[in-house]
A protein has these predicted regions:
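N-terminal Sec-pathway targeting helices
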Residues: 1-17
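Mixed-charge, polar/low-complexity N-terminal
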Residues: 4, 79-81, 86-87, 140-141, ...
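Hydrophobic alpha-helical segments and their boundary regions
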Residues: 5-6, 93, 152
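Surface-exposed, glycine-biased beta-strand/turn segments
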Residues: 21-115, 121-123, 161-162, 171
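Zn2+-dependent peptidoglycan hydrolase active-site motif and core
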Residues: 100-153
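Beta-rich strand-turn-strand
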Residues: 145-173
Length: 173
């Protein structure tokens, strides 16, 4: 009877471990490729997306140059899903441009050091919906902002065109 209980426990542990592995696997694979890219961006330059261009006929511009490291829904720990798309420039913080992906109304709350949002009243893919594009990590580790002076803290509902320079990639979270 003890042997059956131990085998059952091992089976439960194996299945649980396999479930955790499957949950994290896509993120782990992306993390591995991201580390390769960050160690030597020039060696993987063909992995970079170009700022200001579109993917096929998509209405949105690529907001910055770099490697798309993490996607919406990636998991880094159980019960948590990433809520964004992280693009890594592979250069020194403050050097890689960040531009508006689509025209809309920009807001930067008074206490935001590294982030802004752009409200798009009519999603080009679903015109009956309003969406927001969110731009973040635009400051150094000490919180010194890389957002351009045109958008100081407290900016609210300022219209910007697609391609407008918003700031530069940083490494502040």
């Amino acid at each position: 009877m003890l042997i059956i209980a131990v085998l059952f426990l091992l089976l439960v542990c194996f299945l649980g471990g396999y479930g955790v592995y499957r949950w994290l696997s896509p993120s782990l694979q992306r993390s591995h490729k991201l580390l390769l890219y960050l160690r030597d961006p020039q060696a993987y330059a063909d992995w970079r997306i170009p700022v200001g261009q579109r993917c096929g006929t998509a209405p949105f511009l690529f907001p910055t140059s770099g490697y798309i490291g993490y996607l919406w829904g990636d998991s880094f720990r159980l019960g948590h899903r990433h809520q964004g798309i992280d693009i890594f420039g592979g250069e020194t913080a403050g050097k890689v441009e960040v531009r508006a992906a689509y025209a809309g109304y920009l807001t930067r709350l008074p206490d935001w050091k590294s982030s802004l949002i752009i409200r798009v009243p009519h999603d080009p893919l679903h015109p009956d919906r309003q969406i927001w594009t969110y731009y973040t990590h635009m400051a150094d580790p000490d919180g010194n902002s890389y957002i351009v002076a045109d958008f100081p803290p407290g900016t609210s509902e300022v219209y910007v065109e697609a391609g407008t320079l918003l700031g530069y990639q940083g490494n502040y979270s």
